[in-house]
Design a protein with these regions (language model features):
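Acidic catalytic/metal-coordinating carboxylates
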Residues: 30, 56-59
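Alpha4 helix (beta4-alpha4-beta5 surface) of REC/receiver domains from two-component response regulators
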Residues: 59, 79-97, 104-108, 112
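Active-site residues of response regulator receiver
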Residues: 49
Length: 216
């Protein structure tokens, strides 16, 4: 399984799901890295986050669909409510809404898309009701990344990326306060309003989570 995901917390959850399913995993944190992987490695399954630092995951979905031979199963994931429709329109075979922690949801989706006579899969053909719990150290890493983006650049493109990134992380971590603040930032950005107060609120919450590991 190749996971194209910039959030370490979300990727850790998928890693645990793959581990419980008997599948091997590789990670790419951006489109560029994913393209390098796909030049030398042909996975059975690709799971692509839609909000990546160097572009939209739909770009990679479309590229994979145009390739021959095509990767067997192409799945998308996002914390956005509109993500599924966008991903399927781009050619994804299926979609995972964040948070993705249910082993049964993960296994059932992949197994439903695999040929019944496919013997080469590393995914076991059994389904478990277990939920995985990603390590919060990965969440801290995501907060450090968000803080770096906030300090570096607040241009429109970066604000859009930051909103997508934090929305997915907040949903994956069930962090309602961070999710609410991120949603307000996203609305203000779409309305082309001044973002000073919304950015300050998000930055404050990110710093709180970097300092206090018990917040989430």
């Amino acid at each position: 399984v190749l996971v194209v995901e910039d959030s370490k917390f979300a990727c850790e959850g998928i890693r645990l799901l793959c581990l419980r399913s008997g599948a091997r995993i590789r990670r790419a944190d951006c489109l560029r890295s994913a393209r390098r992987h796909l030049q030398v490695y042909r996975p059975s399954v690709v799971i692509i986050d839609l909000g990546l630092p160097d572009g939209n995951g739909t770009e990679l979905i479309e590229e994979i669909n145009a390739a021959s031979p095509r990767v067997g199963i192409v799945l998308a994931t996002s914390g956005d409510s509109f993500g599924e429709a966008v991903a399927l329109a781009a050619g994804a075979d299926g979609f995972f809404a964040k948070p993705l922690v249910s082993l049964s949801v993960f296994q059932e989706k992949i197994l439903s898309l695999m040929p019944k006579d496919y013997a080469g899969t590393d995914i076991v053909r059994t389904v478990s009701n277990e939920n995985v719990e990603p390590d919060l150290i990965a969440f801290q890493d995501d907060m450090a990344h968000a803080a770096e983006v906030l300090q570096k650049d607040t241009a429109a493109q970066q604000v859009e990326y930051l909103t997508l990134f934090l929305r997915g992380v907040a949903r994956s971590a069930s962090d309602d306060a961070l999710l609410d603040a991120t949603e307000r930032l996203g609305v203000a950005h779409k309305q082309q309003r001044q973002l000073t107060s919304e950015l300050a609120c998000v930055a404050g919450l990110v710093q709180e989570r970097l300092i206090d590991r018990t917040v989430v």
